[in-house]
């Protein structure tokens, strides 16, 4: 029986390895299908949608069909959202590049922009999970991604640490990048953000100081 259990765990592990490799290749293909710049956002949204279904226990979901449906469905919305995020990122980068801290006030300004940049990066961790979980207007994804990244800072820092660790792993083993890069990172982020969303959905389980977050997400609870 112990042998059967070990074999079952090994088969399950191999199954997940194949899942990550397959979805990573799908992400690469659909990114190229959109000529790169127009494909990366809908391909990433489709990848997160598949990861979300797996995390919800839908193990038998048709991956290719789901990926293609999400890719088509999110093509314009995700690209518009991506354009907004890219603009914000470029503005932050230019500000940091142009501001040389020659005196005290510029030091303060540069530090403030760096904090804003950190918040922007933290917000990015939540954008795609929210995009595939809720059907909102574009501005709400930015708003609530920022809100969650601050309100659940411990989860945000966990995602940051995991992302840095995965980047070091991929840099050490570049041969696995085509198979286990974006898919692995997206699964980790989706699982953590999904746990955050479950906390938000809890009725009466949130601390009072965070109750306004649940009401913002689910106005019927007001």
Swiss-Prot record:
Subcellular location: Cell membrane
UniProt-listed InterPro entries: DUF624
One Pfam family recorded for the sequence: DUF624
Keyword Transmembrane: yes
Transmembrane segments: 25-45, 80-100, 111-131, 160-180
Keywords on record: Cell membrane, Membrane, Transmembrane, Transmembrane helix
GO terms for cellular component: plasma membrane
Protein name: Uncharacterized protein YteU
Record organism: Bacillus subtilis (strain 168)
Gene name of this polypeptide: yteU
């Amino acid at each position: 029986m112990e042998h059967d259990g070990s074999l079952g765990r090994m088969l399950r592990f191999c199954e997940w390895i194949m899942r990550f490799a397959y979805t990573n290749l799908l992400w690469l293909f659909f990114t190229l299908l959109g000529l790169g710049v127009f494909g990366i956002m809908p391909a990433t949204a489709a990848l997160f949608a598949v990861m979300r279904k797996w995390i919800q226990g839908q193990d038998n979901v048709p991956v290719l069909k789901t990926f293609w449906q999400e890719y088509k469905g999110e093509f314009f919305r995700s690209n518009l959202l991506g354009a907004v995020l890219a603009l914000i990122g470029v503005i932050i980068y230019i500000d940091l590049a142009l501001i040389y801290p020659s005196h005290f006030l510029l030091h303060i300004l540069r530090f403030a922009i760096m904090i804003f940049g950190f918040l922007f990066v933290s917000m990015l961790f939540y954008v795609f999970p929210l995009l595939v979980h809720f059907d909102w207007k574009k501005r709400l994804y930015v708003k609530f991604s920022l809100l969650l990244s601050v309100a659940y800072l411990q989860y945000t820092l966990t995602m940051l640490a995991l992302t840095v660790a995965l980047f070091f792993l991929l840099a050490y083993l570049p041969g696995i990048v085509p198979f286990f890069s974006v898919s692995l990172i997206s699964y980790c982020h989706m699982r953590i953000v999904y746990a955050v969303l479950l906390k938000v959905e809890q009725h009466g389980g949130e601390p009072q100081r965070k109750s306004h977050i649940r009401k913002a997400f689910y106005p019927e609870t007001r």
